[in-house]
């Protein structure tokens, strides 16, 4: 990730951006018989958001018409494009699909419309799971609505676990036991070790599972306190560095993302993997198209994210997408109504089945179609509800990049030196003493 909003508040930059987007106002004109023309900036998916846009437009009975604009694939590139538009006061940004870690940054800059009406707040938050709800507020106000949420599960090959004599579904199953089990069977563990946001997701989950925080007192802005140098940070470093230097580490750990981990897990070397629920549907589709043997799919089991300490429940990763209304939209009332439609329980369930992205509202997991598509629906719901968000700070980009740079490559990670180095590095970045 490239810095924070501090880099886009310079008058010369904003002036240039205004010129670049001055012609976009027409995108929000009412040109459909009085219907408000809304533009929804979406992250790439399989077309599910475009479908919801059409269905909610139809259901509005002429009140609004939603057009979607696709953002880049990478989260940091999505952020960059939205920042450029919003810094220029672009009125075409009526709705945006926003990665949860960026909500605080955007809200702090005044780019998101706060929801203040009590009835609106109730409609947008009723039944939303606790994990994603933590990411939707800033400074005591609701500034975004969880659209879909995500979490990582522990995926395991039943045959490997049985041969190693371990039960990954046991409440006290830890990273150490998992590494030992994989080593005993000469197998490899799939993780996300590339220097990117997925690596930050893993590290944050480990620190949170140990009862710690990467940074605390985030409401203090640049004066927040980096707190990796702690028992929880040391325990996280022991897991990351210990796995990286063990025989259970994949050969491509330093460059592995979600797909590399999935490929390893489905191979003869696979044993355990932490990854998002999409991997289950991907494996099923691979069987259907003949690229994966059915016996491999039948060998896949799932459990809650592994523990750091046998006596402390894990804090699974939290991902997903929040919806926010642009602060400069000329159709904020209609945009808010559209958010209510898009994030309804019914549409949460539909999107989970069709796009494979888990719902943010608890009731969606009781939908028969969801339960058929996701046999582990209850576990996903529990994991999202008890997940730990990444640091909620307007300077998230600086925080995440500081962690990624000081913890990579994973073979170099050791306690207590790595967490201590991270705290120093992060503090220098936040106070402008070091450039990213």
Name each model-derived stretch.
Residues 100-151, 209, 297, 301-303, ...:
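Hinge/lid segment of periplasmic solute-binding proteins
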Residues 180-183, 221-254, 301, 305:
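Glycine-centered hinge/linker elements that transmit conformational signals in sensory
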Residues 83-85, 92-94, 124-160, 311-315, ...:
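A structural signal for short loop-to-beta-strand junctions that line the ligand-binding cleft
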Residues 2-104, 121, 428-436:
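Conserved N-terminal structural module of periplasmic/extracytoplasmic solute-binding proteins
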Residues 278-296, 308-406:
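C-terminal lobe and pocket-closing loops
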Residues 143-147, 152, 176-229:
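Extracytoplasmic/periplasmic solute-binding protein
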Residues 117-128, 171, 193, 212-235, ...:
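Short, solvent-exposed loop/beta-turn-alpha elements that line the ligand-binding surface or hinge
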């Amino acid at each position: 990730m490239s810095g924070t909003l501090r880099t886009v508040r310079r008058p010369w930059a904003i002036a240039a951006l205004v010129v670049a987007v001055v012609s976009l106002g027409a995108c929000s004109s009412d040109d459909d018989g009085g219907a408000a023309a809304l533009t929804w900036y979406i992250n790439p998916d399989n077309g599910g958001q475009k479908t919801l846009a059409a269905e909610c437009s139809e259901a509005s009975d002429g009140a609004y018409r939603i057009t979607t604009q696709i953002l880049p694939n990478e989260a940091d590139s999505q952020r960059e494009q939205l920042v450029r538009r919003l810094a220029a006061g672009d009125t075409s940004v009526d709705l945006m699909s926003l990665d949860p870690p960026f909500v605080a940054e955007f809200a702090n800059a005044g780019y998101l419309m706060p929801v203040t009406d009590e009835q609106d707040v109730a409609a947008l938050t009723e039944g939303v799971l606790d994990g994603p709800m933590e990411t939707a507020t800033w400074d005591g106000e609701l500034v975004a609505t969880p659209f879909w949420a995500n979490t990582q599960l522990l995926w395991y090959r039943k045959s490997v676990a049985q041969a190693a004599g371990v039960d990954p579904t046991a409440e006290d199953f830890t990273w150490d036991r998992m590494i030992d089990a994989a080593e005993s069977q000469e197998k490899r563990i799939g993780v996300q070790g590339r220097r990117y946001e997925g690596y930050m997701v893993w590290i944050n989950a480990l620190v949170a599972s140990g009862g710690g925080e990467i940074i605390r007192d985030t409401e203090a802005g640049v004066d927040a306190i980096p707190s990796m140098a702690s028992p929880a940070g040391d325990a996280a470093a022991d897991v990351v560095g210990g796995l990286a230097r063990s025989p259970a580490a994949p050969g491509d750990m330093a460059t592995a993302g979600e797909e590399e981990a999935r490929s390893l897990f489905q191979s003869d070397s696979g044993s355990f993997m932490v990854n998002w629920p999409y991997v289950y549907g991907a494996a099923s589709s691979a069987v259907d198209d003949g690229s994966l043997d059915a016996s491999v799919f039948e060998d896949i089991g799932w459990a809650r994210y592994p523990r750091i300490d046998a006596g402390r429940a894990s804090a699974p990763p939290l991902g997903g997408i929040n919806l926010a209304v642009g602060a400069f939209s000329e159709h904020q009332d209609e945009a808010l109504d559209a958010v209510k439609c898009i994030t309804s329980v019914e549409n949460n369930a539909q999107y989970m089945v069709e796009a494979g992205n888990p719902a943010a509202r608890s009731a969606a997991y009781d939908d028969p179609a969801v339960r058929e598509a996701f046999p582990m629906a209850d576990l996903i719901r529990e994991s999202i509800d008890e997940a730990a968000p990444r640091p909620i700070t307007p300077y998230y980009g600086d925080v995440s990049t500081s962690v990624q740079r000081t913890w990579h490559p994973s073979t170099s990670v050791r306690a207590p030196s790595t967490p201590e180095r991270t705290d120093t590095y992060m503090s220098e970045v936040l106070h402008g003493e070091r450039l990213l």
